[in-house]
Amino acid sequence: MEVVILNENGDSVGNLEVVDEIFKSEVNNNLLYEAIKNELANRRQGTHSTKTRAEVSGGGKKPWRQKGTGRARAGSTRSPIWVGGGKTHTPKPRDYSYRLPKKMKRKALLSVLSLKYGNNVLKVFEDFTFDAPKTKRMASFISKVKEPNSRKVAFVVGKDESLGDNYNKLLLSLRNIKDLKLVNADSMSIHPLYYADEVYFTKTALSKLNARIKG
């Protein structure tokens, strides 16, 4: 299939041949859910920690004698039912990350791209050239090509030797724009693509993805 390439003004300047699989795959919502859940789990720091009764300082002495006071028996001031006591079933640092099979990741990526393409919110632009990084230029470009009701944009970029220093200048120009998420074509995440109102590719980024999918 052929995908239309747009310039900075949103006008068509050519086409790019890509495999149908990228934008014409069946959308698997269950797989998208699993892939996004995996990405969010892998991001978790898992540093949460509270103290058990064994770890709370103090509480070694019996607060009062066992019998004769009329009060409930108590063996420690650090019991979980006491104020200042330890926690029961306390959270401890743990690793939430887990591995998702490569084939599932691949199908989830094709699903989200096909979903966005089918909803007509995916656009491909020719590669940008810069004399110097310019956020103002890219912010103006985004506001010009973005649909009125769209807010979040996922911008997929790809590095190539032929671009020279333009790749780094593009990153510097885009990274401070509000509601824009940069995505690397070499390691694409499902989460930012799925939750973006619009998805933009540079021509190089789509070419790299096409080569990867073709194998």
From Swiss-Prot:
A GO BP entry: translation
Encoding gene, per UniProt annotation: rplD
Assembly and interaction partners: Part of the 50S ribosomal subunit.
Family per similarity comment: Belongs to the universal ribosomal protein uL4 family.
Superkingdom field: Bacteria
GO cellular component: ribonucleoprotein complex; ribosome
The name this protein goes by in its record: Large ribosomal subunit protein uL4
GO molecular function, one term: structural constituent of ribosome
Function as written in the Swiss-Prot or TrEMBL entry: One of the primary rRNA binding proteins, this protein initially binds near the 5'-end of the 23S rRNA. It is important during the early stages of 50S assembly. It makes multiple contacts with different domains of the 23S rRNA in the assembled 50S subunit and ribosome. Forms part of the polypeptide exit tunnel.
Alphabetic keyword roster: Ribonucleoprotein, Ribosomal protein, RNA-binding, rRNA-binding
